[in-house]
Amino acid sequence: MEVGLSMVPRVDAFLLGAPKSGTTWLAEALTQHPGICVSEPKEPNMVATHKGTFPRDDSRPDWSAYSTCFATDGVRIDCSVHALACPLAPHRVAENWPAARFVICLREPVSRTISHWNMIRDTGEDVDNGSDWSDFAQAWSDPRLQCDTLYG
């Protein structure tokens, strides 16, 4: 499909999941197969408006930039896990890649949520985005953590 002056790249599959559910491990394992091209970076975040736990961006994807995320032909897999929780992603995928396949990684939600919360605190992502998740109850009241925890 052509959008403006740039072509939407071929993508065969999407690896989706909540943060801390094993997607990085699986993406790394998939890179070992010579017939698979995992997106580089792992999470180009072009299809979803969710650009991680905090940032959101509703602008149209830059298909030219997205094309550079796939270095080889093979089975192309976009590993932008946040597309699972993004309400716009299903429409974009259906419109541009109607035959795409999906691999979805899930994890028991309580330990996954605590692991995600700890990661956000360890990286300072909460503070960098104007939030204070130092207390779990306060973090849980933030709909962004709930969105990732409840799988969208």
Regions found by a protein language model. Name each.
Residues 89-92:
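A short acidic, amphipathic alpha-helical/loop segment
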Residues 1-84, 95-105, 110-148:
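PAPS-dependent sulfotransferase catalytic core
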Residues 152:
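Long, charge-dense, solvent-exposed interaction surfaces that engage phosphate-rich ligands
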